[in-house]
Structure formats: C-alpha cells, structure tokens
Amino acid sequence: MTSTPLDKIRNFSIVAHIDHGKSTLSDRLIQTTGGLTAREMSAQVLDNMDIEKERGITIKAQTVRLTYKAADGETYILNLMDTPGHVDFAYEVSRSLAACEGSILVVDASQGVEAQTLANVYQAIDNNHEIVPVLNKVDLPAADVDRVKAQIEDVIGLDASDAVECSAKTGVGIPEVLEAIVTRLPPPKGDPNAPLKALLVDAWYDAYLGVVVLVRIFDGSLKAGQQVRMMQTGATHRIDKVGVFTPKATDVEYLGPGEVGFFTASIKEVADAAVGDTITDEKKPTAEALKGFKEVVPVVFCGLFPVDAADFEDLRAAVGKLRLNDASFTYEMESSAALGFGFRCGFLGLLHLEIIQERLSREFDLDLIATAPSVVYKIKLRNGDEIELHNPADLPDVMQIEEIAEPWIKATIFTPDDYLGGVIKLCQDRRGMQRELSYVGSRAMVVYDLPLNEVVFDFYDRLKSISKGYASFDYQLEDYRAGDLVKMSILVNSEPVDALSMLVHRSRAESRGRGMCEKMKELIPQHMFVIPIQAAIGGRIIARETVRALRKDVTAKCYGGDASRKKKLLEKQKEGKKRMRQFGKVEIPQEAFIAALKMDED
C-alpha cells in the first residue's frame, strides 16, 4: 500500500452536544462510503460499550478511515475521529481535535445550540480548526433551520449561511456532508522524508495484542520492524504491526504523513503509552516534540467498597483492568472502620464516576458501596506546608490549619427562560456567583462561578428536575479559593462513622447534618437500647435524631399488688439498658449508607 498524497487526505472530528446525532451521522458516513457492508452495519457502530449504546452517549473516542470518491472524480481518504460530547470526557475530545485539521459541528435543528456545543466548538477554535456547521434532524416536525442558523451566528460567531442540512437518520443530505468535508476542510501538512514525528492519540488494552496505540503521523513514516522511542517516557519499542480502522482493524504496510492508524509493539501496560506523547524513530529522532495535552487530573474522589468483604480481591483485579483502558481513572487502597477494605478512586466528574461504577457491577459482577463524592481540597498549614486532601476523614487537626481552599468552576447553563428563576435560585443556594446572563431567542444562557463541592453532590439532578430536563450544563475548572469549610462528622451511638464524614461550608452544615441524621434514623433498625445519631463539627453537636429502644414488658408477670416489686424490675431493666448502651455495638445496614450518601437536600 503506497502512502496517500497529502492533498487527498482529510482528518476531521465531529463535535456536538449529547444526543444531537454525532454517532448516527458517523454511522451514515461509514455506510455511504462502504466502510461496512449492510450486514455488518449496526446502530452506533463506533459506540462499542453496551453502556454507550444504552445511555446514548459516547465515552471513548473512536477513529475510522473512510475511502470516498468525490464529485471531482478523485478518491479521498477521510479519517473520522468520533468524540464524546459530555463534559466529563472533554479530555477525550481534546485528544481527537489535536489529531485533526477540521471539525464538523453538528447541531440538532430542533434543539439549537446547547452548553456542550459551545465548550467543544471553542476547543476546536483553539486548535485553529476549519469548522463546517451541519444541521441534523431536519426531518423532524419541530426542526427550525433558520432559527438555529441565527443561533450559531449569534452565540458561536460562525457564518452559518452555507451550513449543510441533513438527517442522519433518513440519510438525507449525507452526500453533501461528504462533499463539504472534501471541499471546505484543509488537507494535512507534513514531510514524508523528515524524521518520524507522530502524536500518540489514545491507547487501550487488547487481550491478544497487548497495548494497541492510536497515532496520527505528522512527519516521516511508521512501519513494522521499526524501532521507535516515546519522547516523554524515553521507552523504546519495536513495532510488530501497523494498521488502520475501517472500522474493522486492517493491517497496512506503513503509515505516512497526515494518516491516522494504530500499531502494536508488545507494550505491557497502557500507563507506558502516555497519551499526548510524541513518538519518533530511535535511530533518527526528531528535534522537537509535539505540543502534548494537559495532564488529566481527577476532580472527584470517592471510596468504593465491596458489599461482601470476600469480594475485595475481585475488586482489586477489576479496578486494575479498568485502569488499563482509562488512564484518567486513578485508585489507591484505603480501609474504613465501618466498611472494611476498599479503594479511594479519582474520576473526571460525576458521569465518569457513575460509568466506572456501572462497568464494575456489570462487567465484573461486583456489588459495591460508594462513599459520598468529595473534591480535592488544598490545605495551608500553620507551619507553612501545603497539602492536598482527597479524603475528608484525613483532615489534620483544626489547630494546625491556616486555611482550606476548595476548587471553583465556571458553569455555563442554557435553559428555556420559563425555568430561569428556578435555575438562578438553585445556583444561589449552592453559593454561586453570577457572572453573566444573556438571551438567545427564547433561551437564557447563565454563567455562574460555583464551588465544585456543591456541584458533585446532586446539582445536575436538581437542575434537570427544576427545568423538566430542558436545561443543559457544562463546566470548566477555574481556580482554588479559600472558604469557611468545616469537617462534619456523623456519630452513631457516640462513635464517629468515618465513611460519612465530609467537608461542608459552615453556612450549609446545619441543613446537611439534619438531613443526614433524619435519613439515618429511618434506616437504622431499633436495638434494645436508645441510639443517638448526631452530626458534629469538632466537639459541637449541630443536629440530633434518636432511634427509640425496643422495650420488653418486664412487669407483665406481676399480677396486681406491690408497686415496689414493679419499680425494682424496671430499675433493673434500666441498669441493664445503660450497660448495653455502653458496650453495645450498633450495626449500620448497607442500605443506610447508600441512602445517606444519595441524600437529596430539598
């Protein structure tokens, strides 16, 4: 196979908000160009995971090489990078965009521009991409093409007069989309004779091949038998085989400049293939590395514990396997007095956390308890040291702390203006600070600064219920700001439960504490003695609920008569209960943990 001339290659990604039809459009492009036969075609070809198909979201970015005979009679190679639309997987988007020269912006003709449309388009603009707007779902009765074109021009500032109109579902307008890719997107640049310079876009683990590495070649060429070096890690590998996805893996002789493909080199761990690294030839290295990506840092942490302690080793094996495919997921062992052994895991956001939990229970058949999600706090100590806190239970003594800083985000929310009041109230309740408010037709766009701590709990669910599901939400991390944060502990029978401790803002502590205590009271079964459930900040109790004791009627045998006999029996019972309370252990059922952590705070 000879290398394709650069002017016959187009590398592009498809960016859009969730549910605007990216994956369906990808399916149509693959079908139209003959990437798969009609028999092999299935809905959402590029969404390999069951969870992706069920939730209708794309999690891992995928890549496909399409061969297209254009109207000018020439044959072009189109490399499509499918990207996720959800905010948690923004790092997947940034990787795909760095490997392309152009983007197709898909906007639902009935919904219009949404929050994540904006976030992803701005990423594409930052990468100096040529952008072709495509209006999808024009066959829907609710489609309003002119309104959406005006929105694209007003909100994003792109000229939408020649936007391509299509319906990925029915196949209308797909040939026009392919023509627009060829005529309006630029070809890649590159020198086939220069030393090899390739960008490592992604890596995943395959049971047979070991680690499969997805690359975009900028200069030089890559072929089997070549000795290559990773510039970031310094590791060297001998390439076993080189290929492309059509979307089936197909071996090729070599990859030239501008091409996107994969190679295997018996690399043992995905961690050895750092995403964003530059790959070059060991004998003839390139002088400078490519601009990589920002290091992905976990934003939300939570503890995962097996319901049955005997499953701990299975959980260890499962998180290890997930880490092979998802370098942004981190974990370390931790033990809790209440829940036993488990792992403290780091995620990119709440959806990421939910997906990993679901994959653990579905693919590895594990029953898990997740502790309350918390964010990373920066703590300045009196002696001048700074530490990062991942687990609220590990907070140092209050007397040593100078200040606690928490992460803040910039949240962009699009909502129909009927629900604007409720959305603003929600943001204000969560200590938000309004930055701007503007209208796009009948929809409002509000931008707020919010503490991430207030968002990770249940902000997204509340936003969806306030707006009847119409609001869309996107966020970027801004900075760390000092705040009046306190550690709230939950005590059951005067014993602190480490898995339920959390850092909260002082102004919210009382309501959060009361809610937790009420929830626990409903779920802890009655014992033979009274059980106080308390929320405390340091030594000060801020909320209390009591689980009443079960009581045996000890005076039932006394027929009539002597009051002192009854009194004696009651006193004896009282003494026994007092002793029981002193030495009795309260078993907290698993569902009490799960419910307390899922607590909604209306």
From Swiss-Prot:
Record-linked SUPFAM superfamilies: EF-G C-terminal domain-like, P-loop containing nucleoside triphosphate hydrolases
UniProt keyword Transferase present: no
Catalytic reactions of this protein: GTP + H2O = GDP + phosphate + H(+)
Cell location: Cell inner membrane
tr-type G domain ranges (all copies): 7-189
Gene3D superfamilies xrefs: 3.30.70.240, Elongation factor 4, C-terminal domain, Elongation Factor G (Translational Gtpase), domain 3, P-loop containing nucleotide triphosphate hydrolases, Translation factors
GO BP terms: positive regulation of translation
General function of this protein: Required for accurate and efficient protein synthesis under certain stress conditions. May act as a fidelity factor of the translation reaction, by catalyzing a one-codon backward translocation of tRNAs on improperly translocated ribosomes. Back-translocation proceeds from a post-translocation (POST) complex to a pre-translocation (PRE) complex, thus giving elongation factor G a second chance to translocate the tRNAs correctly. Binds to ribosomes in a GTP-dependent manner.
Sequence positions that bind GTP: 19-24, 136-139
Entry's Gene Ontology molecular function annotations: GTP binding; GTPase activity; guanosine tetraphosphate binding; ribosome binding; translation elongation factor activity
Family, similarity comment: Belongs to the TRAFAC class translation factor GTPase superfamily. Classic translation factor GTPase family. LepA subfamily.
Leader sequence segment: none
Domain of life (superkingdom): Bacteria
CDD domains on file: EF4_II, EF4_III, LepA, lepA_C
A GO CC term attached to the entry: plasma membrane
Source organism of this protein record: Caulobacter vibrioides (strain NA1000 / CB15N)
E.C. no: 3.6.5.n1
Protein name: Elongation factor 4
Membrane topology: Peripheral membrane protein
InterPro entries, per the entry: EF-4, EFG_III/V, EFG_V-like, EFTu-like_2, G_TR_CS, LepA_C_sf, LepA_CTD, LepA_IV
Keywords assigned by UniProt, alphabetized: Cell inner membrane, Cell membrane, GTP-binding, Hydrolase, Membrane, Nucleotide-binding, Protein biosynthesis
